[in-house]
Amino acid sequence: MSYASEVKKELTSLEVHEKNAKAELMALIRMNGAIGINNRQLTLNTQTENPAIARRIYSLLKEFYHLEAELSVRRKMKLKKNNLYIVRLRTGVKELLNDLSILKDDFQINEKVPEGLLTEESELRSYLRGAFLASGSVNNPETSRYHLEIYSLYESHNQMIADWINKYNLNARTTERRSGYIVYLKEAEHIADFLQLIGATNSMLKFEDVRIMRDMRNSVNRLVNCETANLNKVANASMKQINNIQFIDETVGLGELPPKLREVAEARLIHREVSLKELGELVPGGPISKSGINHRLRKINQYAEKLRA
């Protein structure tokens, strides 16, 4: 089961009060429902690839609207051949759609929730939960870049969802996608907060655990890379020093160096892998500070370059 499926499974197990059930259904049916006419009667088909969501819709209709829907399943034949679960309602459709403010009196669809309809925070959260169940997705935090999105057919509805999410300072952004629009979150902290907001507490905790481990691994990797780079830098500098000292020795002899440079050159040939600080403590005339050792080694390098010129 994917992480997104785990989140949705948790959400479909939540108990809700009547007003919140209405808000959740308002999103589920507005975003996944299709109105039809059969024998001069309105019908409503709500489709999903997730059986838990289909059961959720069926249960909410029965418990809070006392409507008996039909559950059916068929196999999609295009692209991914997943099962498609259909919740079909043949009676009470117009009354339901009117109560959910989805259908206007002239049988036009309300593209978004009318202003002032959902006034309580619990209702807003429930609508966002329904919207995520209907057409939301979230990447697995273990294997992917952080990303959560909700798809909407209508731009006005998409912007409404973004505005509601941003009431909680989650930096939701919008963009056009295929034949519709999406609102999305990219920051890990905001995704975790959104999961908590819609009631997916266990999924949020799992997300946070994975995020913390990823951040720790990334920090360790950065430290290791930095340390490796520093070691390589030191090793390369040491090799250059040794090559120059050997060149001087083979060309004119180390005795041609001033005494202070000669003692550092001889110490470096003997102690090739030590740091500058350690080398300063090993020089016979020492101890010499790290900056002092570095200064003398630069002089030795310059002497070698003059010999090569």
UniProtKB/Swiss-Prot annotation:
Q: Does the keyword DNA-binding apply?
A: yes
- Taken from the record, one Pfam family name reads HTH_WhiA
Which superkingdom, per the lineage? Bacteria
Q: What residue ranges does this record give for the DNA-binding region?
A: 275-309
Q: Membrane-spanning residues where? A: none
Give the family, as the similarity comment puts it. Belongs to the WhiA family.
- Mind telling me what this protein is named? Probable cell division protein WhiA
